[in-house]
């Protein structure tokens, strides 16, 4: 078990501990539960889905990287597939506050980058900030997405974001988590192709500026992130954050990164290179390359 889970795990009910122990045994537990595992945990504990999600929130929050705020937020995105995806907030010392990943963004990006096609609900241990409410409004689940908070009845995003502004106001039809493939040819080595594949998945209807990042760890594991734009612009999630989020959720740390590649168009309206390189260098990675899409 990864050390970050030990304190939260010890506070769980005995029957939940027993059912979770074999799942968490892997140091690189991917911070997600397949639908079959969710069913196993429900049967072992007698908890319904909502109660189980609340019980697991401390494990999600244990994934937080909060060197600045020391305020851990955990979220669980429940996919329409039945799979559950953990998320937690991330802060990056030496970078800028704008690079921060919120817990809801973390869980949603986690689900999206794992191939989930839509979300049924998000469970979170603190009320979503305005930034996250706007981020969630980009999803193909729309304002019907259910949000679950401890001690409160479940509500929809519509309740938390009244008079919402979103992609439909800008006549955008393809939404975040809809399947997209921008068709850029795969070239180069495995890591380069992974970055291009991530760029092909980008949700960028406002700038038409696709981008993707691939991070290679010292053990050969590769994590990718795709660019996810938002109708309100500022809640947009850069591709590097998506990749770093997956890396961290899978139990890796920044010193494990040995190489990084950004894929983007050289003449795009928005360029990720400077911000990507600056953040990676702040985290100790200097082996950074850029491949141009075309």
UniProtKB/Swiss-Prot annotation:
GO terms for cellular component: cytosol. It catalyses: cytidine + H2O + H(+) = uridine + NH4(+); 2'-deoxycytidine + H2O + H(+) = 2'-deoxyuridine + NH4(+). Its EC number is 3.5.4.5. The keyword Electron transport does not apply. Substrate binds at residues 89-91. The active site is at 104 (proton donor). It comes from the Bacteria. One of its GO terms (biological process) is cytidine deamination. It holds the Pfam family dCMP_cyt_deam_2. Residues 48-168, 186-294 form the CMP/dCMP-type deaminase domain. It is an enzyme of class 3 (hydrolase). Keywords: Hydrolase, Metal-binding, Zinc. This enzyme scavenges exogenous and endogenous cytidine and 2'-deoxycytidine for UMP synthesis. Homodimer. Belongs to the cytidine and deoxycytidylate deaminase family. This is Cytidine deaminase. It comes from Salmonella arizonae (strain ATCC BAA-731 / CDC346-86 / RSK2980). The lineage of its organism: Bacteria, Pseudomonadati, Pseudomonadota, Gammaproteobacteria, Enterobacterales. The gene is cdd.
